[in-house]
Amino acid sequence: MTLATRSLIKNLSSALGAQAEREQLIALISIATQTVAPLWPLDSAIAVNPLSGFEEQPFEEVLPEAAALFGARPTLSLNEWRTLMDEGRIDQVSLRKAVVNALGGPDEAFALLGPDLNAYNLLVARLLDMEAEDVPPVRRALSPGMATLARWLAAFFDRNAALRLPGRERGLYACLSEALRHDPALLRASNATGRAWLENAPADPVDMLILAARRDAVGPERRLPWLRAMVASLPGWAAHLRWRSEHAGPATSLGAPACMADLMALVALVQGVVQPAPRAVPDPDCPEDVEAALLVHCGVAQDAPAKWPEAGRARLRAVAALTHAQLGLIFQEAAESSFLGQLAPQLEGASARLAAPQSTLRPEAQAIFCIDVRSEPMRRALETQGRFETLGYAGFFGLPIAINPACAAPARNQLPVLLSPSHVVPERAMPGREAEATAMLARHAALGDAQAMLDTTKSGAIGFAAAEAAGPVAAVAMLARTLAPRLTHRLRQRLIGERGHVLAPAACNDQDHERHDGQGEGIPLAQRVAYARGMFALTGLSPQTARLVALVGHGGCTTNNAFAASLDCGACGGHPGGPNARLMAAILNDPAVRKGLAAKGVDLPHDTWFIAAQHDTTRDEVEIFDRHLVPASHVADLARFERALSCAGAQSRDERAARLDRTADDLLTGAAHWGEVRPEWGLSGNAAFIVGPRALTREVDLGGNAFLHSYDWKKDDDGSALTGIMTAPMIVAQWINCQYLFSTIDNEIFGAGDKTTQNVVGGFGVVQGSGGDLCTGLPRQSLFRDDGTPYHTPRRLAVIVHAPLQRVQDIVLRHDAVGRLVENGWVNLVVIDPWKHKAHHWVRGDWAVRPC
């Protein structure tokens, strides 16, 4: 709890009267809402830090607190950490440093307790040698009351996947409190007192919470943790509700209004009807028992400590008292140090080489990829094919847009969820392909209608008759998708057509952008120039570009995957980045924009042409868009570039297949197979966000574990470009990193569990089995190998910046969104000094010359 929160509670507690109590509770509800992060729906799923509401506290303090609140594990088990160490993901030197740090420094660690015995030996024994029993998480199954409430929540929030729940227009609390009064399962699970509580519930949710607080004798000082526990009792549904309240458009809530107070009140109502079962709190190792076991392990008599100085006995007690969370954090710090210890010296050497004169030869082509970690292997492979240069930029290419589809569908935001779209860009048929576009949209609509009809047959009274009629057809389709998935996929694509081949964002085929402004669509010339200039400023891309420059968005390609959007571009709101790449390429090829750029000092060569592409991260293939617009003078350049991309894709596919323990050909099959549970590792393994020129990392094999954002500090005099990078893409990368970290630590609570036992609910989320709480994180198959060992190493994001120390420090101190992550240890900030070429690690407000 922050000082500001404590002050608020104290001030409000001193007020008297019902109105003051109500105002206090409303203020606390707002704070308690932050207990969970927003959960985006499946069609625009993005990664978020599930503990983002705790970022104002130090990371090491949050782990046990959040574990207790959500009933989760605070860290991997000691046996899992030992497995990671056996695999070489933690080195001995880094573990030694982490142990010494945990003990307070070398003096404390190596002071003799007895003959040949010190605290360092004791702690290493606890970490590596002594028998370790996995401490179970403090979780409980949903009570009958909570399971019933979860079922009604699914009905209320449903997106037309089932029959409409009557009374939704009255709001979540009013609708469901009435439904619960008549729910037979809930009534059977309650007694007379519970039924009376249910029958006499107040009509207002805040009044309901006040009544429940008084009943449970929850005083003002205890009400915030009490409300947080309400949220944490159904964290998935609470997270969905937070997204709905804070990030969804008004249309989402139309006809079904809901707020977090409604959910808290319903939880309080149900808890009054059916008391939740107490959590089974595991018995932690008794420090005295651990102390005795340590002495036995080290061959020391049990009465020996009585002869030690008090300082020695205190050190023994301190090591024995370390909790499972504290031991796990030592391993985690060692894993982070191992990664940085290997990477930092390589970057220091590369920084020194940057001082030497660089080649002035014009590249054959340049490719600007998304910063996504999956771009790194493809970039590295492409650079081996010839004189190709690659850069990294946020995959929405700096365009704050929403795409208005040509079909009858809502506008789709193509930008980070931290931002709101400034422009709505219409999707239109390419010139001369209007008839083809009309036919393709009709086929898409027919396919959608058929899918809707199929979904309808899966429930309701018509399901039996429909199953009889549709069974033979469905059986043929099932066999085809199972036995020949790639062929089936190609036939399906040929039948319905490739949308990107006949439709495009309007700026890709309209020269007169301004004509859309009266309708609120399109981007005015001045802003198009600004967005184009921003790309050069943030990446450090020289205006002396290659003849061919590719803007490469990315997206995944999977079949029958509820989490498909999580493999698309997070910077594009969980959608493929192709539309943004096409729009930016069209902007940069526009003579009016070129003229505007030249006036601002960005004078592009007359023979430079920008093309748009999309990197399929599941198949390692790159699709080129709008090739019909490429001038005849650049056709040969494009052909050479495509050959290089094909070779790079094959190389990257081989590398990725080895990590998946599969063949490269099997990856192509898996992308089309509806039974594939692991089409790719996604962003598993992500460990670093590196900001600097490509020359800093070009000679380093980062193994697809790093976000790479191009940046040249010499071209950023006022630090504005670096500020933009650290306050937006870096924070998104930290969200991704934390989702992978916590989904690995406890996949049942912070993740989504096993894919094979999941069901989609309401069209927006997944649950395990037939119902219950919404899953908030990543499925097990995205993080763990088939044998159960973690593929992803849980470690905090290493933010590595090649820039002057003072410039980075100013940003950390000036921007709270960055400062709290750095100061509270949610990221490890490392700066490579561009003059002395040394890595400096920010440790609680000061710089250390070597990373931890």
Curated annotation (Swiss-Prot):
Belongs to the inorganic carbon transporter (TC 9.A.2) DabA family. The gene is dabA. Forms a complex with DabB. This is Probable inorganic carbon transporter subunit DabA. It is found in: Cell inner membrane. It is a peripheral membrane protein. Part of an energy-coupled inorganic carbon pump. Its cofactor is Zn(2+). One of its GO terms (cellular component) is plasma membrane.
